[in-house]
């Protein structure tokens, strides 16, 4: 699964881990995150994330 980096603060969203503190189950693909999901560290929207290898 992919990892996505916040271009603002560097937070890594790992699809394997999800974001359990914010109700996102492990295995949730980035494109399947709710539209109102934001970076848990800085509050940046999904549009500020880039896929990394």
From Swiss-Prot:
Any Pfam family: Rubredoxin
GO process terms (BP): alkane catabolic process
Cofactors that this protein relies on: Fe(3+)
Keywords: Electron transport, Iron, Metal-binding, Transport
Domain of life from the UniProt record: Archaea
Protein role: Rubredoxin is a small nonheme, iron protein lacking acid-labile sulfide. Its single Fe, chelated to 4 Cys, functions as an electron acceptor and may also stabilize the conformation of the molecule.
Family designation: Belongs to the rubredoxin family.
Protein name according to UniProt: Rubredoxin
Organism of origin: Pyrococcus abyssi (strain GE5 / Orsay)
């Amino acid at each position: 699964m992919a990892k996505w980096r916040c271009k603002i603060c560097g937070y890594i969203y790992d699809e394997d881990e999800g974001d359990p503190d914010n109700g996102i189950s492990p295995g949730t693909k980035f494109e399947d995150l709710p539209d109102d999901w934001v970076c848990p560290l800085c509050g940046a929207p999904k549009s500020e994330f880039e896929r990394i290898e």
